[in-house]
């Protein structure tokens, strides 16, 4: 995601002062029998959910959280160490205090939260309702984070305000209310008043709360054990309680307490991106129902710090509720279901996913099984020996874990039948719908079209068609395909890369969605400018705009580029629109529109219109054809990065350089050797693989491996940039296997350098048949990728075979991967002539 506020500090002054990122050891299970549910964890032992939870600023933070849910779950549950908002997620690994456990729908660090709820245990004489008062200290060694359960030991005697001084903005929406940004260059934000405070943390606690958390798609299951080592008499003991934060500042919510049913339920309308995009879903609410295992001895509500005991219902801002339990209570379990449909649907989600009598262990096993069904399909052998903090197996499995969280299935069940009718709320129509299909949200498409969606065709093919149908639902409702959808369109980032996501599905054999409608949707992207196209800049986070689509398409269609003196990010837009045209042509051919496909393919050559032959860089142009300043017109990059942004026509790109492929190779060398590559942002992800396409696969192997070492590790600081809904991890997952989708609208993968000596992938049913498991080639099959020596000093490819058939070019077809039994790389200690396409 792009830089929102150039100099924004989020309170972490430096990890050199405030603590180092924790390594892979933080997730290691502390003794096989410490909890019975850690048995038979299989490959999940190699997943560290804390990777990407640390960074000194929002842009060098992966933006991930140690969350628990099932693959593609609507709601993720996480420990809360911070109030989240745009540029800050609920957890940061530098923090030493937990303020509760949050049901979050914030998909990425540069996106806003919506419809969250927070539950916090307490064991103090007076109820602590505010974030800054309910701090509970913990030690990193007492955390266990896995895909299926999170556990932590909390100091129940922590008192006072710890960790953060919260300004009004931080307690509400953060530094960007409504998600709106400023006109570029006119505003620079500072630290917004947040200073991190270090609290003293002892190594042992007199009274402690042992917390454990697991979660299904819509329901969190929390368990709190209250352990008192003070030997006080029963009369002296303090009653434990659970507080629930329903709303934050500036948002009015409702809450009710039902002691008979042992329930607390309510709703809030918070949607932090409310200023972005064309949609204003007035009736949006996030609903929840919490059901407790123990009876209440007392209860009440809170508005800010004001507690009202005995009140069983309230509405207002900074709204909360609490329930107390008998002083001798040792364990409390609470199951909290979330819905975007209604309170009744939240209660139904609870009864379907975690009915009364469901043990915590059962919930954990269900979630564990869901993740093992995905990650357990892959067996890795032959891993480079290195220190624990750079363990490639941990990075790889965690990467796949990250990638299989998105997009999120926002549909909700109506019965326990897996084939039941689904119900869901659409922010586009501001109404509830029913369908026999899932409905997916959280579409960070400018990021994920590059590799994440290709990954899903291999590891989750059963969901791909439904995802494409969700895109078309959005087109039906809004008249446009999404750019960055977070419940509704936000207009974040540029271009119409949903065109490429749909083309990716088609080129990978997925066709169980409406192809004529797909062509209608992408054709509109290609030929119909957005509303007020010539009147708006469409700058980053410009509030209250219509659907951005291809801003500047008016000039792009007039003379082949987006005018820099009329639209923001013009050069990046021109290059992206050229690629989008190539993707639209794929869809056109799929429906037999050959003439329009040919026209779009010709227009896909517009990238050459922003090539400055004098400087030999891509460059923004003004309306009169003159060149703009070479620092203008870019999105998360510069002239170096975007000169290589021609995913669909690398041969044509090479032809622009004097000397052709030789000239392009020299520019690539200067790019990497000069430190211009920015792997933390997505436009750089395909760049090292260009070497392979111009006859230098040995250089590709070197660059790919260097990036994998430099930009990834197995600690909480293990991502050099934002995860962006799986794209950062998808790059690593593919690269470690030995190939990457440079042109995601096509069916090709470009060879780099495999990291492992042997990988066995049990591909899901339907991977070879476009998601149709019942087809002739639909059953599961196991693909073995062999690369002997890859982990022991042989990084270069010397030869490649697919089921014994020699492959001379460094390119694999999707069909090769999903139908083959064995892909065998012959590896070498030094560069070879394999894959060279003539002299450079």
Where in this protein do the model-derived segments appear?
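Carbohydrate-binding surface patches
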Residues: 744-745, 757-786
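ATP-dependent phospho-/nucleotidyl transfer catalytic cores
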Residues: 580
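Fungal secretory targeting signals
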Residues: 1-21
């Amino acid at each position: 995601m792009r830089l929102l506020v150039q100099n924004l500090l989020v309170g972490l002054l430096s990890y050199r002062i405030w603590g180092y990122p924790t390594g892979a050891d933080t997730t290691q299970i502390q003794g096989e029998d410490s909890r019975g549910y850690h048995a038979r964890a299989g490959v999940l032992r190699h997943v560290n959910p804390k990777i990407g939870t640390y960074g000194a600023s929002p842009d060098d933070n992966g933006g991930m959280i140690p969350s628990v849910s099932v693959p593609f779950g609507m709601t993720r549950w996480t420990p809360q160490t911070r109030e989240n908002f745009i540029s800050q997620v609920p957890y940061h690994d530098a923090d030493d205090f937990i303020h509760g456990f949050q049901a979050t729908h914030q998909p990425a660090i540069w996106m806003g939260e919506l419809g969250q709820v927070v539950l916090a245990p307490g064991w103090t004489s007076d109820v602590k309702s505010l974030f800054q008062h309910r701090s509970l200290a913990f030690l990193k060694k007492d955390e266990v984070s896995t895909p299926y359960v999170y556990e932590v030991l909390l100091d129940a005697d922590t008192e006072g305000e710890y960790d953060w001084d919260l300004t009004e903005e931080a307690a509400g929406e953060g530094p960007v209310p409504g998600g709106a940004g400023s006109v570029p260059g006119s505003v620079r934000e500072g630290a917004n008043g947040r200073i991190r405070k270090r609290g003293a943390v002892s190594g042992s606690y007199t009274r402690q709360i042992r917390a454990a958390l697991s979660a299904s798609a819509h329901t969190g299951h929390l368990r709190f054990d209250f352990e008192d080592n003070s030997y006080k008499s029963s009369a002296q003991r303090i009653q434990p309680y659970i507080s629930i934060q329903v709303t934050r500042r500036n948002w009015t919510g409702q809450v009710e307490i039902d002691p008979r049913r042992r329930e607390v339920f309510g709703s809030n309308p918070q949607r932090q991106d409310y200023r972005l995009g064309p949609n204003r879903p007035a009736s949006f609410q996030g609903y929840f129902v919490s059901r407790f295992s123990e009876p209440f001895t007392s209860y009440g509500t809170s508005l800010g710090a004001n507690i009202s005991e005995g009140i069983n219902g309230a509405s207002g801002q900074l709204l909360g509720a609490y329930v107390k339990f008998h002083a001798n209570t040792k364990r409390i379990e609470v199951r909290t279901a979330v819905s975007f449909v209604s309170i009744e649907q939240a209660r139904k989600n609870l009864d379907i996913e975690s009915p009364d009598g469901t043990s915590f262990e059962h919930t954990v096993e269900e979630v564990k099984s869901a993740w093992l069904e995905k990650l357990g399909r892959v067996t890795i052998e032959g891993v480079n020996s290195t220190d624990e903090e750079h363990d490639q197996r941990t990075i790889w499995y965690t990467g796949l874990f990250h990638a299989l969280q998105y997009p999120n299935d926002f549909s909700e069940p109506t019965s326990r039948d897996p084939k039941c009718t689904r119900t869901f709320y659409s922010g586009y129509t501001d109404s509830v719908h029913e369908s026999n299909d899932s409905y997916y949200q959280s579409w960070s498409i400018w990021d994920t079209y590059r590799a994440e969606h290709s990954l899903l065709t291999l590891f989750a093919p059963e969901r791909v068609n439904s995802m494409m149908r969700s895109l078309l639902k959005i087109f039906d409702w809004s008249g446009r395909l999404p750019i960055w959808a977070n419940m509704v369109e936000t207009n974040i980032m540029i271009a119409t890369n949903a065109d490429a996501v749909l083309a990716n599905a088609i080129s990978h054999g997925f066709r169980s969605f409406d192809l004529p409608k797909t062509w209608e949707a992408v054709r509109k992207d290609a030929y119909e400018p957005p509303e007020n196209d010539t009147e708006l800049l469409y700058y980053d986070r410009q509030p209250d705009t219509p659907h951005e689509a291809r801003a500047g398409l008016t000039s792009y269609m007039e003379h082949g580029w987006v005018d820099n003196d009329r639209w923001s990010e013009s050069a990046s837009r021109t290059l992206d629109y050229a690629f989008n045209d190539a993707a639209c042509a794929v869809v056109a051919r799929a429906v037999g529109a050959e003439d329009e496909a040919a026209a779009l393919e010709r227009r896909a050559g517009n990238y050459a219109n922003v090539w400055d032959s004098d400087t030999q860089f891509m460059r923004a142009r003004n309306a009169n054809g003159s060149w703009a300043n070479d620092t203008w017109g870019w999105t998360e990059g510069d002239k170096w990065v975007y000169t290589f942004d021609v995913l669909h026509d690398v041969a044509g790109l090479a032809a622009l350089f004097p000397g052709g492929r030789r000239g392009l190779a020299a520019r690539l060398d200067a790019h990497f050797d000069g430190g211009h590559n920015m792997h933390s942002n997505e436009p750089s992800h395909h760049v090292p693989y260009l070497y392979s396409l111009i006859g230098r696969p040995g250089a590709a192997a070197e660059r790919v491996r260097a990036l994998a070492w430099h930009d990834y590790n197995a600690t909480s600081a293990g991502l050099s940039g934002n995860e962006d809904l799986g794209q950062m991890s998808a790059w690593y997952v593919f690269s470690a296997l030995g190939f990457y989708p440079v042109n995601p609208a096509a069916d090709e993968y470009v060879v780099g350098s495999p990291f492992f000596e042997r990988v066995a992938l049990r591909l899901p049913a339907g991977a070879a048949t476009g998601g149709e498991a019942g087809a002739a080639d639909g059953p599961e099959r196991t693909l073995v990728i062999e690369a002997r020596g890859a982990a022991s000093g042989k990084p270069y490819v010397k030869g490649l075979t697919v089921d014994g058939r020699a492959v001379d070019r460094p390119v694999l077809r999707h069909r090769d991967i999903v139908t083959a039994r064995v892909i065998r790389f012959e590896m070498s200690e030094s560069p070879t002539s394999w894959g060279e396409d003539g002299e450079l």
